[in-house]
Amino acid sequence: MQKVGISAIVTAYERVDQTLKTLRILESCDPKPDEILVHVDGNGIECVDAIARTYPQVRVLVSNDRVGPGGGRNKLLAAASHEFVASFDDDSYPIDSDYFARVLQLFDRFQDTSIISASLYHAGEAISLDEREARWTADFSGGACVFRRAAFIAAGGYVPLPVAYGMEESDLALRLHAQGGKILSSSWLRVFHDTDLKRHAEPQVTAGSIANLALLAYLRYPVSLWSIGILQCANRVLWLLRHGRHRGIWRGLTMIPGHLRAHRHFRLTVSNRAVRSYLALRRAPAHASL
């Protein structure tokens, strides 16, 4: 079997059958990753046992308390044996069987890349052709990307949050950007996310998405740019109202003070210039020549 020098990591929480499906697809890739590691959140013993029975070669890490997908990925990347670490959710997996060979080609072509983000498709969405195109972007999807392990560790990893919407990837991407790291997004890498995203309408997700935007601004923006964070929170609330996601809005707003206090030890701001250039790249990604 061809060795590719890639670790694959999966963050799992409660969805046992979907976790096993993701592992089956990873194992069927050609070439497949050199190792697969799974983090099981919230002491999910049923999931741990199912993996041990079906895929005994997979390394399993367990957290007794909920640390969220970001906290799980922190542990997985610390334990990974290889420099390139392909990251998936328990319900996301490669569409193309040669996914990992393509990953190596992209890292070889773009050797200054910190993260490569795949095109992510959800249930019910049309899947586009795997065109050999790429661009430099501000953001990435944690369940459909490949990390350069050294860059991830140098940036400090994720802030562990049980409900991380609106915070975890943006926060890490901003810190990477401030350090000169680069994120490449490519349509040549395709990942399927086996969900219809209905859970995004749950009240706790709505609340978390508001409070996390405030947390991002508090942890990373200089005080002179806190007005941008306030505007981002306001825009999020307006978007939620327009889309009928009313439940959780008030909770999200009222939890902000406590949310900031609870995570104040993570505060490490980046420069005014870094925030502005990051937001500019988010608005206008740059073409990368393949």
Regions found by a protein language model. Give the residues of each.
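Short, acidic, metal-binding catalytic loop of nucleotide-sugar glycosyltransferases
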Residues: 24-33
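Short beta-strand/loop segment that forms part of the nucleotide-sugar
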Residues: 33-43, 61-63
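A conserved acidic beta->alpha catalytic loop
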Residues: 40-48, 92-93
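Short aromatic/hydrophobic "clamp" motif used to bind/position activated sugar donors
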Residues: 85
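Conserved donor NDP-sugar-binding/catalytic core segment of glycosyltransferases
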Residues: 93-130
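A short, conserved alpha-helix in the catalytic core of glycosyltransferases
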Residues: 145, 151-156, 162-190
